[in-house]
Amino acid sequence: MTDERIHVLRDILLELHNGVSPESVQERFDATFTGVSAIEISLMEHELMNSDSGVTFEDVMELCDVHANLFKNAVKGVEVEDTEHPGHPVRVFKDENLALRAALIRVRRLLDTYESMEDEEMLAEMRKGLVRQMGLVGQFDRHYQRKEELFFPIMERYGHDSPPKVMWGVDDQIRELFQTAMETVKSLPEIPISTVKEAFEAVATEFESMIFKEESILLMILLESFTQDDWIQIAEESDAYGYAIIRPSEKWIPERKSFVEEKSAEEPVQLDTAEGQVQKIIDTPEGQFTITFTPKEKEAVLDRHSQQAFGNGYLSVEQANLILNHLPMEITFVNKDDIFQYYNDNTPADEMIFKRTPSQVGRNVELCHPPKYLDKVKTIMKGLRDGVKDKYEMWFKSESRGKFVHITYAAVHDESGEFQGVLEYVQDIQPYREIDTDYYRGIE
């Protein structure tokens, strides 16, 4: 990262700040930054934002389109073309940020107006409006959950495990700041409006900074790393977490291209020989070579409907799966290597107490939880592995869901007593708490 590049970037940003069109600086930007990664440019932008250069958050956000054009051709064709589709996860993510920023602006205007208002009747109505608008801002949690539960697991698979850890921690800080701000809004008029504005600006500042990090750093990493299949998986699993303020206006159905090409004349000639061996004739600059080998046998496909010895009886894999999915509880299994290996499917994802999606399977259990809960997760796993306890139990009442949630973490051992993992089962016990009789055997 050279000083010269930073100076050029600063000049371009200031020109944008003064009203020049992005198109007028595109050529100079391309000439200076071709070959520089999106990540490096984003770091330079971040450095300028935090200096006394005069560059603002809005300036950098405007430049995002400029360097997005630069990287458009470097990212695999169809994925980049589709990111502007209304249902593509990238477009949805950015549209949510626009809607959330608009909600922040509305709250800020309401607070300013409230501060100068004297009509008590109008003030009462404005307090209701503030709570409504803050409620809209509060939908950012759905946006963050999709990022944390759908984007981060795939990033980790590609080796980008540091940004998720840092960003998730900041997300939680923003959640806490928002809760504080919301409580102050609801405390009006008992507390000064200046206290409310201070709490709101604290969360708004961090919130806008996170939008920058998401669009100028996070999305650039994703566009350079993720495949079309990754984006399809994210799109399919997004409904489970919901959306912030807006929803996709239509479903994204990508154009799928076939990667299977017809055999050409240049391909090696393959000949079958006796005893299951195969010969291939390969053309090289030195002439033709013939190689002989035995192809690997295809593994037999498991018949999910064949009966297998199963505990005290017999079941097919299909029957075992159906039974697990019909148990009145959410089950998760983490194996002895701390890998999230399985969860049952007994309820739609958007109704689950603890949401699980296929993209989480295969993650280290420590990466499946917010940083603030990491110490507790480690303590539970170690306690069960070391035999300190056979199980840990927790419970809490969820007023918003009308549920009383009971959670059990139980050690799983094989017949020889060897630790094999941890079984988590979660259930709503509120219906049992409401039983008011000692006897019932009816079938109504």
Please place each PLM-identified region on the residue numbering.
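Small-residue-biased structural context
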Residues: 1-141, 145-392, 396, 403-405, ...
